[in-house]
Amino acid sequence: MPGAVSATPPPELATAARTLFGDRLSLAVAYAGLLVTDGVVRGLIGPREAPRIWDRHLLNCAAVAERIPLGSTVLDVGSGAGLPGLVLAVARPDLSVTLVEPLARRTAFLVEAVAQLDLAASVQVVRGRAEEIASGGGGVEPLTGDVVTARAVAPLDRLARWCLPLAVPGGRLVALKGASAVEEVAEHAAIVDRLGGGRPEVHHCGAGVVEPPTTVIEIARERVVAPARPKPAKRSRGGRRR
């Protein structure tokens, strides 16, 4: 049963949890409680992930806070159950965080979690896709942030296409990645450049605190690039568009 999983960090992770969350550890435990109960029931967290909620999810995400400047506005794209955006809001009360999520059942969970954790002053939830948030399409108000975060969303080229327009000029995309980070940078650096991004950099967060450290790819938005225009439809021999 989901409720049988403890929300407190296991003894071997207690020091890391205190280091990353400080005096807001009790708030992190409350969030963990939501994830291993309601999050599992509603299909946002897999049952097998619940016992590993601290090492694979909460600590993994909290370590990224070291890459985010003080007082930043953060847009978390494809937030899902709030990873990493809600974790960052818990760990860093100086941040202003917007959780961007297209699916209704996930946004419903996020809205409830923000209310239960009493984070409404620093966290808002927006239902929509990154492309809509950037352009204001679909009736969604356009938004930008100093930092755009994303976790396990897509390959780097697509991620940059979706997320870089959400960063203010001079802002950055911080994408949580795994062992493929270096290969993705080598493969997609040219595309990132065409999208107005700087050279992607790989960083390892939480070294000496979490094991293994959290790997992120960081891309600065150096230039504003106009979005590509859609190609016109081809005409058939009869003159009709196809």
Curated annotation (Swiss-Prot):
What keywords is this UniProt entry annotated with?
Answer: Cytoplasm, Methyltransferase, rRNA processing, S-adenosyl-L-methionine, Transferase
Extract the GO molecular function terms from the UniProt entry: rRNA (guanine-N7-)-methyltransferase activity
Q: In the UniProt record, does the keyword S-adenosyl-L-methionine occur?
A: yes
Q: Name one GO cellular component term.
A: cytosol
Main location per UniProt? cytoplasm
Which InterPro entries does the UniProt entry name for this protein? rRNA_ssu_MeTfrase_G (IPR003682), SAM-dependent_MTases_sf (IPR029063)
**Protein's job:** Specifically methylates the N7 position of guanine in position 518 of 16S rRNA.
Residues that, per the record, bind S-adenosyl-L-methionine: 78, 83, 130-131, 151
Organism equals Salinispora tropica (strain ATCC BAA-916 / DSM 44818 / JCM 13857 / NBRC 105044 / CNB-440)
The UniProt similarity line reads: Belongs to the methyltransferase superfamily. RNA methyltransferase RsmG family.
The name of this protein is Ribosomal RNA small subunit methyltransferase G
Q: Which residues form the signal peptide?
A: none
